[in-house]
Amino acid sequence: MDPDYKARKEAFVSGLAGGSILEINAVTLVASVSVFLWSILQSRLSFFTPYSAAALLVDFLLNVLAILFATTLYSSAPLLLNLLLISPALLILLSTKRPRTPVKAKPPRQSARAGKDDSKHATALPESLPIHPFLTTYRAAMMVITCIAILAVDFRIFPRRFAKVENWGTSLMDLGVGSFVFSGGVVSARSLLKSRINGSKRLPLAKRLIASTRHSIPLLVLGLIRLYSVKGLDYAEHVTEYGVHWNFFFTLGLLPPFVEVFDALATIIPSYEVLSVGIAVLYQVALESTDLKSYILVSPRGPSLLSKNREGVFSFSGYLAIFLAGRAIGIRIIPRGTSFSRSPEQARRRVLISLGVQALVWTTLFVLNSTYAMGYGANIPVSRRLANMPYVLWVSAFNTAQLFVFCLIETLCFPAVHRTTTQESESERVDFATSRIMSAFNKNSLAIFLLANLLTGAVNLSISTIDANTAQAIAVLIGYSSIITGVALALHHANIKVLPF
């Protein structure tokens, strides 16, 4: 890369101060409103069944391009975009009646060989850990925003206040990094719950650490590949983001072994929320009572690997706390929750109340931590670079609130999704209530994230992104979004899962 252009690129994403949380909430609300419109179209009109070319186009427009437009063309007027999306949803809602029963997806043809297995599936009881459409949608929406932002940030059409801040402040991309980790924590609860239900004997910690390290190897390899690619191509870098050598794949790769250690601690402190807050508190105390904060932010970079990568190394504590907070939420919302004395309606109400209370608690802790709060708050600014306690609380509060909103939309539009007595009928209702594109992004989230990184690098090496005008930027971003969506759908159609996470 040309040295002058590289310097311009690095300056373009450096020294930024971010924007307001209210604006970030308004922009991300577009994802929820788009899902609401999709759900109204499907629940009232069965618009996406069968999945025609028109259905694919509208699905792409609502669940991918709406987010792209919210962060670019409508970045200064996100509320207007929300209004444009919610208006047709309300119009359809008021002018149509809810069908008595959801329209069933067309079942695949049965072969003679598969007939016996399909018959068993048709009469089998639903799983105790069901697939939740709202959880699929939440995770996919987060992934769509992340993939769009990592390329859009290199164009001038993407506001600088949405890009990652230098030291202190909040931004859309700062929130996206933490949300990626939080969502990973949410879905990680499924394996933990499954082992509890099966009553399988817990392996010794040493064996679990070895197994989790094996699980981490693909992520660490991806981190090394990214490191050598960036250095080898002389690619523009934002060193204060993670350090000289560290990158986000290393953070993701180191999470599983550390989570296993805290799983062992959970037998003593049976609350992942407490463990999460405990890590955040201890890390914040270390930042405030020692020279650690100044060492991370302003100390000259020495020759040691620790000094060169201090942001990535020390911020890992914050990301671990975020992951455990997500795991705590997953434990609460993934189980079916029904019993002889609790109906599906009561179980769903319980999930909504739990998410609402959790969102309120995390938000209260965040306000007390990051503002004066009428003289009672600590007024500590948010720092993604440090991944300090206010950052952990902000990410946890936002994601819990997002889950609450998506769960509420599903409850209102598809109330019968889990009111079934067989796996087959429940599977049909889950498919009916889930966007094909969102299912695809959720199924191969890490692989799509990797593809997005590769395409981002290819685009930046091919064109001068910071010199592109609005039309050129939008054309490139729509093409890029189409490619990652197409690949996600192709993998989903072929029932291929490339990487775990």
From Swiss-Prot:
GO annotation terms (biological process) = GPI anchor biosynthetic process
Mode of membrane association = Multi-pass membrane protein
Reported EC number(s) for this entry are 2.3.-.-
Primary location group: endoplasmic reticulum
Gene Ontology CC: endoplasmic reticulum membrane
Q: Which residues are glycosylated?
A: N198
SS bond list: none
Which domain of life does this protein belong to?
Eukaryota
MF annotations from Gene Ontology: glucosaminyl-phosphatidylinositol O-acyltransferase activity
Q: Which EC class is this protein assigned?
A: transferase
Question: Is the keyword Protein biosynthesis in the record?
Answer: no
Q: Which pathway does the record list? A: Glycolipid biosynthesis; glycosylphosphatidylinositol-anchor biosynthesis
Briefly state the protein's biological role.
Probable acetyltransferase, which acetylates the inositol ring of phosphatidylinositol during biosynthesis of GPI-anchor.
Family, per entry: Belongs to the PIGW family.
- UniProt protein name: GPI-anchored wall transfer protein 1
Query: What is the protein's species of origin?
Result: Aspergillus fumigatus (strain ATCC MYA-4609 / CBS 101355 / FGSC A1100 / Af293)
The lineage is: Eukaryota, Fungi, Dikarya, Ascomycota, Pezizomycotina
